């Protein structure tokens, strides 16, 4: 019998990367067909989802939960017959019902669902060989970062860190008097450029009318419908996020208002693990295989 693992997406991009790495390892270890399901209101839009941006290599996969027979017994049971249920804030209210640990040996259901929150392990040294940008995404990001110098430090100015500790701003200016600026907050960018006019801003910044009560909110977590009403294209925003991630990953030095920002720390870690070059490499051609369930199939790209 074919067995499956659904990896839901929630929270920020680097939470998702960690969870994707976790799910890839589980799928390989337990011989399961993987579906990374990022069809939630934070990431997906206009029929675009995880597989619109990334190719998987070396792990069997399907691209939608609709390719999994819905009648199969599922663990946790909350997802039974409802694999397409969107991840959202409700996950935190039902942690006990969605908890998933593959090492618990008493779970033999054909379908497992990892909720996208909670405990996970990740291996970024392997991840860049298991996940690749789709060719059209790689080409677009390459274009977006082509004119960004690689010899300057990067400064990450996250809107949610506006209330920075005393002296932190001055520390950043001393560490990177001229820098590449990655930010989601227009007010922080304006402040930085006032102090460092020769710095280069690469990010589209947070529109002021999306910032509630003077506090920046991550644009990547803003509902695509809200963004659309503000004239912000979600696909462009996702591309910008990926480009910013690569810019920080490849920088010789990088600094942040909050070094504990997961986007900042994981981009640096990804770069240190040698991921920047390989993730741009085209994935091998996917082969299509039939499953034991009539009318169902999965895909597989052989590792080089």
Predicted features by range, described:
Residues 1-178:
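Secretory-pathway glycan-assembly enzymes, especially type II membrane glycosyltransferases
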Residues 11, 17, 21, 239-286:
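A donor-sugar binding/catalytic signature common to diverse glycosyltransferases
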Residues 38, 157, 181-183, 255-258:
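Short beta-strand/turn micro-motifs composed of small residues
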Residues 42-46, 162-165, 185-192, 287-290:
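Short, charged/polar "capping" segments at the starts of alpha-helices
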Residues 47-58, 188-198, 266-269:
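Short, aromatic/basic amphipathic alpha-helical patches
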Residues 157, 177-232:
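Catalytic donor nucleotide-activated moiety binding site of glycosyltransferases and closely related
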Residues 218-236, 240-243, 254, 258-259:
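C-terminal structured domain segments
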Residues 282-304:
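Leloir-type glycosyltransferase catalytic cores
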């Amino acid at each position: 019998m074919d067995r499956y693992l659904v990896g839901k997406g929630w929270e920020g991009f680097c939470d998702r990367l960690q969870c994707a790495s976790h799910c890839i390892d589980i799928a390989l270890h337990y011989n399961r067909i993987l579906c990374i399901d990022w069809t939630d209101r934070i990431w997906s839009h206009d029929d675009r989802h995880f597989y619109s941006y990334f190719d998987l290599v070396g792990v069997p996969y399907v691209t939608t939960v609709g390719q999994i027979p819905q009648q199969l017994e599922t663990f946790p049971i909350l997802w039974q017959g409802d694999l397409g249920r969107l991840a959202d804030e409700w996950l935190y209210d039902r942690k006990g019902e969605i908890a998933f640990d593959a090492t618990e040996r008493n779970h033999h259901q054909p379908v497992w669902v990892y909720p996208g929150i909670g405990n996970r392990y990740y291996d970024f040294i392997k991840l860049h060989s298991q996940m690749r940008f789709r060719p059209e995404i790689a080409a677009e990001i390459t274009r977006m970062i082509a004119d960004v110098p690689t010899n300057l430090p990067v400064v990450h100015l996250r809107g949610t860190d506006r209330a920075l500790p005393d002296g932190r701003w001055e520390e950043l200016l001393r560490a990177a008097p001229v820098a590449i600026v990655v930010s989601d907050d227009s007010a922080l960018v304006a402040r930085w450029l006032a102090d460092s006019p020769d710095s280069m801003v690469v990010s589209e910044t947070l529109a002021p009318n999306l910032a509630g009560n003077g506090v920046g909110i991550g644009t990547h977590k803003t509902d695509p419908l809200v963004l659309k009403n503000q004239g912000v294209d979600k696909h462009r925003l996702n591309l910008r996020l990926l480009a910013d991630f690569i810019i920080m990953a490849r920088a010789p030095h990088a600094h942040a208002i909050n070094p504990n920002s997961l986007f900042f720390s994981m981009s640096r870690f990804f770069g240190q693990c040698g991921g920047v070059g390989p993730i741009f490499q085209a994935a091998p051609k996917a082969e299509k295989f039939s499953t034991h369930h009539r009318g169902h199939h999965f895909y597989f790209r052989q590792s080089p």
